[in-house]
Regions:
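RNase H-like, Mg2+-dependent phosphodiesterase core
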Residues: 1-185
Length: 185
């Protein structure tokens, strides 16, 4: 018996639909660091405004090897119309709670992107139904959005790579804590 592994890649159909409805700046948002016991939560935000900015092998960061994520990160940050990330510390997570910390990280990432493009994002597509809406933005929260939609997948890669790099840096500074083991999601 032969078995096959089907690899699902996200598409840009939602982004294209929103562009056709007049939304020029469509931002994907996702986070990394919601589950681990140590470290910050990081949100990534990616905007593409043409299909030639798509990195073909990008998909949900959880489905990629570290090497492929790093390669994808390099290409995403080079090709995208704009990208950004927001970091909320472990201390702030403890103070705010994880839901508010994720919202804060996403708001920071969004602000970074808006500063880069010089205008307000028209529409947000974000991974997950259990996140809070960002006030005063049109926003779709999509279950498994990081599997389905390119901008969200690219944002998941940005968030994951930035967070992993931080955790590896913490591990070098504080080797007794094993921070390199807290690079989960």
């Amino acid at each position: 018996m032969v078995s096959y592994i089907m690899i699902i890649y996200p598409d840009t159909k939602l982004e294209e639909k929103l562009w056709s409805q007049g939304y020029q700046i469509v931002a994907g948002l996702d986070e990394a660091g919601r589950g681990p016991l140590a470290g910050p939560v990081v949100a990534g935000c990616v905007v593409i405004n043409s299909l030639d900015q798509v990195v073909p092998f990008v998909r949900d960061s959880k489905k990629m090897t570290k090497k492929k994520r790093e390669e994808a990160f390099s290409l995403i940050t080079e090709r995208s119309f704009a990208f950004g990330y927001g970091i909320v510390s472990a201390a702030d997570i403890d103070r705010l709670g994880i839901q508010k910390a994720v919202l804060e990280a996403m708001s920071i990432a969004l602000q970074v992107v808006e500063e880069k493009v010089g205008k307000r994002v028209d529409y947000i597509i974000a991974d997950g139904m259990n996140i809070s809406s960002i006030p005063n933005y049109k926003m779709d929260k999509i279950t498994q959005g990081d599997l389905l939609h390119y901008s969200i997948s690219a944002s998941s890669v940005v968030a994951k790579v930035v967070r992993d790099r931080l955790m590896y840096d913490y591990a070098k500074k504080y080797p007794l804590y094993g921070f390199e083991k807290h690079v989960g999601y």
